[in-house]
């Protein structure tokens, strides 16, 4: 497998906050985050440039808090801070694995991380550093999926790798419906029309407008990130006509 050439040169990996929590359901599981760091290290070893966007749902969910009566903008800002906590945790895990890493935040906090500067982010990637984008888009009402699409476009990534709990996109929730059918390939419009759980509509539309493919795959199987980068047919690929 190591003799294979990667099919993508620059990727944006989208991780959910829940992925970092592992089976405990909340917070950050050190073993899980170390495992993710090791997978990213392998991909860097193939010569691939890696950027990461992480959600914050393992610490705080803005939409859930807003549904409970909290001001939506304030709740979303709390969610953005949660993503920065996750970003710092992943940075530490990556650097312990020997991978130089930079965190850039959409909300300035210079004592903690660099502010998001597009050209600087690209320069880090060219120097084989992992760049983690924290703080979402920096604006309330936008999800971290939308932040992933936006940053992928800005850094001219070849693909978004969306890591999930299941092994692709299904017609229904496979955990609840045993008749759910898995899709190997989808078009952006199919995702939007059928309301499939890939990314939210804003994020999907951004990818569609800029013809950026999305690969949805299962994170919990070791080696899957590397398999996607090498072009193996796992998960579901979403692209244009």
Curated annotation (Swiss-Prot):
Subcellular location: Cytoplasm
Positions that bind ATP: 14-17, 57, 61, 164, 170, 173
Classification via PANTHER family: URIDYLATE KINASE, URIDYLATE KINASE PUMPKIN, CHLOROPLASTIC
GO molecular function list: ATP binding; UMP kinase activity
The protein's name: Uridylate kinase
UniProt record, GO biological process: 'de novo' CTP biosynthetic process; UDP biosynthetic process
NCBIfam families, sorted: pyrH_bact (TIGR02075)
InterPro entries in the cross-refs: AceGlu_kinase-like_sf, Asp/Glu/Uridylate_kinase, Uridylate_kinase, Uridylate_kinase_bac
EC nos: 2.7.4.22
Class of this enzyme: transferase
HAMAP family: PyrH_B
Catalytically driven reaction(s): UMP + ATP = UDP + ADP
The protein's annotated pathway: Pyrimidine metabolism; CTP biosynthesis via de novo pathway; UDP from UMP (UMPK route): step 1/1
Regulation: Allosterically activated by GTP. Inhibited by UTP.
Function: Catalyzes the reversible phosphorylation of UMP to UDP.
Keywords: Allosteric enzyme, ATP-binding, Cytoplasm, Kinase, Nucleotide-binding, Pyrimidine biosynthesis, Transferase
The keyword S-adenosyl-L-methionine appears for this protein: no
Region entry Involved in allosteric activation by GTP, spans: 22-27
Positions that bind UMP: 56, 76, 137-144
Assigned protein family: Belongs to the UMP kinase family.
A Pfam family recorded for this sequence: AA_kinase
Assembly: Homohexamer.
GO cellular component: cytosol
